[in-house]
């Protein structure tokens, strides 16, 4: 990230280097609290103005099913970004928003005079999107002729998982859907997390400690893994939700997942059973929501709700956490999603427009020295984003050239920072 205004900041007992960062582009006041239909109309009119200014015909932005009816009701809601996905070539990004919108933004040159992010395309889901993941091959400019490459998976309550065509820039066009019904009661099992494993496979975490594995070309799961524990009376099934899957993307047959009961499991895709790696109950946290791997594959970084630390697990010594990253305060129900791409970054639970950062050497060692000494892991750098000083940074997603952040508070939006 470009850095300015260096100073020292006390963090607990250590002194961290602090920098101020200024976004070079953001959504500005687009998502400030106002009637939803006005937000949508503002985006559409801005898109039309840009088309005229640049002499380029941008796709017409899709309309919400509720756009006309909401004009009479004057419904005012915060529109918060729930997730961010970068395209494979980092030329565009997608956001999943609380107004059911799926927006694609083109990434401007930091040296240009464009400071406002406005959707290049916008489609609306029919219901609130709980989980999503973009095709690992998606690119707007180098798009494949194969529809599956230009798609996004979305999951919601009481409907099948959908693979949505991103070539259709203003309508929700489903390429295919995937069965998530429970054969015993014929009810849909909500997909709380979706992650691609390879280009042709994806995983879904759902209720009753269950992970489904899908081939993108088949409607039914090709494998299902569950977890149960032994009790004196036989097998007792935990009725917990698989809430997160690790962020790795490789041909490795082993993945990891976490539950809202603070359990972390090993997923061996060749088997049928989830293996318990660690139970993080007892630290006061209320459920895992993100798992990030170190590049060397040795350490897992587990983020939990209502926690003042990020637990570090070593899969070679799974009996207990080997260390933790210290946070300056306790998180709450809101998920602060981190990113690891050269450095490990997460928004501060205290808000104030702050980003906490740990360097690669800390993450790859788990904060353990060669002499096997455990080191306190306060952030190495504290980034301040003055434009967001009264807000909380909820999501951080980096590409090769830029860092995208989502923030909420007095207003909500997304912004781009140079790496």
From Swiss-Prot:
Cellular compartments per GO CC: nucleus
The entry's keywords: mRNA processing, mRNA splicing, Nucleus
Coarse class of the protein's main subcellular location: nucleus
SUPFAM superfamilies linked to this entry: WD40 repeat-like
Gene3D superfamilies: YVTN repeat-like/Quinoprotein amine dehydrogenase
GO biological process, one term: RNA splicing
Segments passing through the bilayer: none
Subcellular location as annotated: Nucleus
Quaternary assembly: Associates with snRNPs.
Family matches, as PANTHER family: TELOMERASE CAJAL BODY PROTEIN 1
Family stated for the protein in its record: Belongs to the SWT21 family.
Biological role: Involved in mRNA splicing. Helps to stabilize the U1 snRNP-5' splice site interaction.
Name of the featured protein: Protein SWT21
């Amino acid at each position: 990230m470009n850095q300015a205004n260096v100073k020292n900041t006390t963090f607990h007992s250590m002194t961290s280097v602090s920098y101020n960062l200024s976004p070079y582009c953001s959504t500005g006041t687009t998502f400030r609290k106002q009637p939803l239909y006005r937000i949508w109309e503002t985006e559409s009119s801005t898109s039309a103005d840009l088309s005229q200014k640049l002499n380029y015909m941008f796709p017409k932005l899709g309309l919400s099913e509720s756009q006309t009816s909401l004009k009479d009701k004057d419904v005012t809601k915060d529109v918060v970004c729930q997730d961010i996905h970068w395209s494979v070539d980092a030329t565009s990004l997608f956001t999943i928003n609380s107004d059911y919108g799926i927006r694609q933004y083109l990434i401007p040159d930091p040296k240009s005079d464009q400071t406002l992010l406005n959707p290049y395309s916008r489609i609306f889901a029919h219901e609130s999107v709980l989980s999503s993941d973009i095709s690992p091959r998606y690119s707007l400019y180098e798009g494949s002729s194969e529809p599956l490459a230009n798609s996004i998976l979305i999951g919601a309550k009481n409907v099948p998982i959908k693979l949505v065509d991103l070539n259709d820039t203003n309508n929700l066009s489903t390429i295919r859907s995937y069965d998530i019904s429970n054969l015993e009661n014929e009810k849909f099992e909500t997909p709380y997390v979706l992650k691609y494993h390879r280009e042709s496979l994806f995983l879904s975490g759902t209720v009753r400690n269950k992970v489904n594995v899908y081939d993108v070309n088949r409607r039914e799961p090709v494998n299902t893994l569950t977890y149960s524990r032994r009790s004196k009376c036989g097998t007792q099934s935990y009725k917990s939700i698989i809430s997160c899957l690790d962020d790795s993307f490789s041909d490795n047959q082993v993945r990891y997942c976490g539950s809202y009961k603070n359990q972390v499991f090993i997923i061996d895709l060749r088997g049928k059973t989830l293996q318990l790696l660690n139970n993080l109950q007892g630290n006061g946290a209320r459920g895992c929501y993100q798992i990030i791997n170190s590049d060397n594959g040795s350490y897992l970084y587990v983020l939990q709700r209502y926690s003042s630390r990020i637990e570090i697990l070593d899969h070679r010594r799974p009996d207990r956490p080997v260390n933790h990253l210290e946070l300056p305060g306790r998180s709450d129900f809101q998920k602060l999603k981190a990113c690891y791409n050269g450095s490990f970054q997460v928004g501060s639970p205290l808000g104030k427009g702050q980003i906490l950062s740990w360097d690669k050497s800390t993450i790859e060692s788990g904060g353990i020295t060669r002499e096997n000494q455990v080191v306190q892991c306060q952030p190495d750098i504290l980034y301040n984003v003055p434009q967001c000083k009264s807000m909380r940074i909820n999501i951080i997603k980096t590409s090769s050239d830029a860092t995208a952040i989502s923030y909420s508070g007095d207003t909500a939006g997304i912004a781009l920072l140079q790496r």
